[in-house]
Amino acid sequence: MQTHEINQRFTEHFRKAGHTVVPSASLILDDPTLLFVNAGMVQFKPYFLGDAPAPYPRATSIQKCVRTGDIDEVGKTTRHNTFFQMAGNFSFGDYFKEGAMEHAWGLLTSSQADGGYGFDPERLWVTVFEKDEEAAALWQKVTGIPAERIQVRDAKDNYWDMGVPGPGGPCSEIYYDRGPKYGREGGPVVDEDRYIEIWNLVFMQDIRGELPPKEGHPPIGELPTKNIDTGMGVERVACLLQGVENVYETDLVRPVIAKAEELSGRSYGANHEDDVRFRVIADHARSGVMLVGDGVTPGNEARGYVLRRLLRRIIRSTRLLGVHEPVLGEFAAVVRDAMAPSYPELVTEFDRIDSVMRNEEDAFLSTLTAGSKIFDLAVADTKKAGGTQLAGAKAFQLHDTYGFPIDLTLEMASEQGLSVDEHGFRELMSEQRRRAKEDAKSRKSGHGDLSTYRTLLDQHGTTEFLGYTDLQAQSRVLGLLVDGVPAKSAAAGTEVELILDRTPFYAEGGGQIADTGRLTGPGVEVEVHDVQRAVPGLFVHRAKVTAGELGVDTSLEAAVDSKRRHAIERSHSATHLVHAAVRSAYGKRAAQAGSLNSPGRMRFDFTAPAAVSGAVLGGVEEEVNSYLQNDVEVQSYTTTMDRAMELGAVALFGEKYGDQVRVVDMGDYSRELCGGTHVGRIGQLGVVKLVADSSVGSGVHRVEALVGMDAMRHISKEHLLVSRLAEQFKVPAEELPERIAGVVSRLRSAEKELEQLRVAQVLQSAGELAGKGTDVHGVTLVAEQVPDGVDGGALRALAGEVRGRLGSRPAVVALFSADGDKVSFVVGVNTPAQDLGLKAGKLVPSFAAEVGGRGGGKPDMAQGGGSNPAGITAAIAALRTGLDQAVARG
């Protein structure tokens, strides 16, 4: 049975049982506790926690999941995977234990002709929590399973909670007996290789309390409504129904291995080392495609770093299989074809996915070869010195110069029997490894922990947001935190966090920064400087009491800084229009990857399918400003997600949407799902002026623009600058480009003449340098440091002149010049030396690391640079050694 059919049978079984079929959530959700979605219940957490009412009593989903805690183990065995699918059914105060058992057992044991999976019930076992006697009795009642195939386990195995105070409950697992071939008799408590878990049923019935960590979180009561959360491992069921040993042989994964076999000419199963590489490719290709599909782009922080690490492990594994051409696009296409029946969006988004992955591959391949040579030399030096640990400085160089993630260096070193000085690496990376975005997010989340905010939400309910229509409102203080601790009052000068019953203040979200403003009441004044949604539905106002004493239950007049808010709204509306214009220019492949809307200025990141040209961006600016002339009304309304999609509304990758969504329309030109605030008519934007564009990551481009009066002031400054230049050059403004081009041309000619004079002066030393040659196994080597400040062009000319003066004898010329903290070097090899197999480009890696650099070139001439002038003497010695070895090898 194919995996897609397994999924179809699952959702159809539960649909017939009255469950709402909910699509898989994005792998990226707005949950600060999770890097990626790693379980089916994650998108339903607000309902289980009571943060929001469940919109349906029963639900079912096939959730895509990524777990990256054991990336290094992937491939070494067949057990580990980073991507998997979790099929689940969920009850929110509806059916409980008995119903969950009936649904699971029915699907597993019904015949395939009747829509089930057709498992032999005699080969199914179950486990229950040791204190859950009710579950053991119900299993026998519901299924008729004999008592000897029901095993009890302690809380470690069969009790679920979130690790913090909140809901919890016993769980019950269903296992399949694969037979004597796989291990000992006696059920899952004896052998979990033979008895494989396929389904876990969690019975959420308890409230877990707060105690010191070592004592856990014991039950302190029962939940008012009992819930069900189950998860069936799709890949495990696929293995059993397809009669294969592990996930790598199933219909969704084996095709990727087959493609790797085709590209490499090697066979899976021939030897362990290659099998590890095949499995790394197969697993990481699936994770990579699904993560990029959900809007993750390779980077150096958080999710982007994990994705980059996955993709670069694929690239290295393919090279170890002997494939040196770009391959990520090939693997991505195989994953798309295999997964599309369950995730059709992979087809519509494939051009973007393919572009992001290929761009990352191109970027890494450009440095992988050079970096690998540096690594090999470092390994050789370490072993030669009798060491067992690669220096932290070398790991840092590989990361900083060649883009090697530390994990890749650790893995490569381990393959060579070496460890890495991680402490030294971390010290060198201390500044670069500060994750600015995460730090900013943690600063904004306030002082209290999440349980404090959840308690406030439970006590007072969600905050009523009035800011779509009102910038002033009467509000009441429901809660007050000082240094994260609930307080009754706060004196002047105190930084506080406020919970209001209703607020006109917008909480940061969707790229729009938070409102600021004032709260005033009898004898008290408060300055609001930030607003965050600490937990869904709860607005936390970060503020400072500037006068009087603030207390809980105080009534206040809340007033948003209206001038600032309107400037932010202009920026946010401009972002929507720029997004529409970018999609008009590049198509749907240009998906939003991030935005920031602040007063008078907007920033928009998008995935670029190709290089972004200035001409296209100029067209984007013109199209936006042209549309502003229509002054259409901006409309917002709430509708169902399905209806919004029918209307063509653009949903953003990584965002979590409910059944009801807010749509912002700007005529037929722009229609997006958005919870932010906007202008009433687009004419209020005035003008949008693009002021910067740049690349901010693999396949991600950023444009920045000024809006309204900020844009007008910028244009006025530019006009004044042009006027002054025209006056200076004594030409009309329209002739400035031609006049400036002429001046630049004359300047370049003068610089060229000056360079020729410098070269002529440098060449005077050629005869002296040629006389300093030494013999290395019949090859004349001239390796010298010339005066400081000689640039690469002059060095090349000098090396060529010296090489020519050495006649027909095999010769190698290497010249170095320092300039401050930089080093330039050139290596020249004459034809007789090339006939001996010597090549300039091949000699560079033998010494470049000593000057902290790299280089390359052709057989006759190579050049490069570095950042360690103090290493020139060592570099010359290393070159001599490298030449000695190269000549000896012949």
Curated annotation (Swiss-Prot):
The keyword Ribonucleoprotein does not apply. Its main location: cytoplasm. Gene3D superfamilies: 2.40.30.130, 3.10.310.40, 3.30.54.20, 6.10.250.550, Bira Bifunctional Protein, Domain 2, Threonyl-trna Synthetase, Chain A, domain 2. It is found in: Cytoplasm. Zn(2+) binds at H572, H576, C674, H678. GO terms for biological process: alanyl-tRNA aminoacylation. Transmembrane segments: none annotated. GO terms for cellular component: cytosol. Binds 1 zinc ion per subunit. Its EC number is 6.1.1.7. Keywords: Aminoacyl-tRNA synthetase, ATP-binding, Cytoplasm, Ligase, Metal-binding, Nucleotide-binding, Protein biosynthesis, RNA-binding, tRNA-binding, Zinc. InterPro entries: aa-tRNA-synth_II/BPL/LPL, Ala-tRNA-lgiase_IIc, Ala-tRNA-ligase_IIc_anticod-bd, Ala-tRNA-synth_IIc_core, Ala-tRNA-synth_IIc_N, Ala-tRNA_ligase, Ala_tRNA_ligase_euk/bac, DHHA1_dom. It catalyses: tRNA(Ala) + L-alanine + ATP = L-alanyl-tRNA(Ala) + AMP + diphosphate. PROSITE patterns: AA_TRNA_LIGASE_II_ALA. GO terms for molecular function: alanine-tRNA ligase activity; aminoacyl-tRNA deacylase activity; ATP binding; tRNA binding; zinc ion binding. Signal peptide: none annotated. It holds the Pfam family DHHA1. It comes from the Bacteria. Its cofactor is Zn(2+). Catalyzes the attachment of alanine to tRNA(Ala) in a two-step reaction: alanine is first activated by ATP to form Ala-AMP and then transferred to the acceptor end of tRNA(Ala). Also edits incorrectly charged Ser-tRNA(Ala) and Gly-tRNA(Ala) via its editing domain. NCBIfam families: alaS (TIGR00344). This is Alanine--tRNA ligase.
